[in-house]
Amino acid sequence: SRRGLHEGYISGAKSVNPFIKVLSTYHPGELTQAFVDPEWGAATAKQAIDKGADVIFGAGGLTGNGALQEVATQSGVYCIGVDSDQWNTVPAARPCLISSAMKLITPAVADLISKAQSGSFKGGNVFGAAGLAPFHDFENDIPKPLKDLLVATKAGLDSGIIKTGYGN
């Protein structure tokens, strides 16, 4: 959910810098419009950059893609994609795209199908796997201690030791 991505991003940012200022904006339109407005995404990303943002997490379908594409036209600003490896789905964002927060839907669905077939699926809310896309052109720019921190953080989130404040 958008709220989950938002809370997770803020929790992660504050875990490395408790004094960080995170700017957040949600599309003001109906849900049917919120994910299909790349112009709004681009304009909102530009406003955040003008307010000093140096990283834009562009979540929200085509709206988020518009944000990523805007960030790619700016210098000294980075972006993070969402849902899949947006290096592949939004090539125009490559100049700024550090990584993407990926919803690993295919393995999660395969696991659910397997459990349903074996009779071990109990129903209820199921949270699938998530991951981080490769750093691609930024691979050599990310220091090893930061990469190690990301691996440890993912393990902590998966095990439940680390909480984001959303849904737990």
Can you describe what each PLM-predicted range is?
Residues 1-168:
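A residue-level marker of the well-folded mature domains of exported/periplasmic proteins
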